[in-house]
Amino acid sequence: MASMLVQHSVKDFAAWKKMYDSVADLRASSGELSDQIYRDASDPNKLTAIFKWDSLANAQKYAKSPELKAAMEKAGVEGPPNIHFLNEV
């Protein structure tokens, strides 16, 4: 199973979360199986997300999608995200 780990900061967590939740169907239709969101203990606007995907190819395709880029901009993501693709062992 493939995973995608994403880290970024946001301007406002509540605004980001609203936008994040609004694209849940897009993520699912792209192959996302599950997600976990974490907030940094010292800065609640620093986020780490771990997503499980049906395939590495779908995770990589979604990460490059214009829909994701637009959603991140609208949600107030600050700077480019750090994205890592992982394979479960």
Predicted regions and their residues:
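Short S/T/G/P-rich N-terminal loop/turn motif that feeds into the first structured element of a domain
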Residues: M1-E67, K74-V89
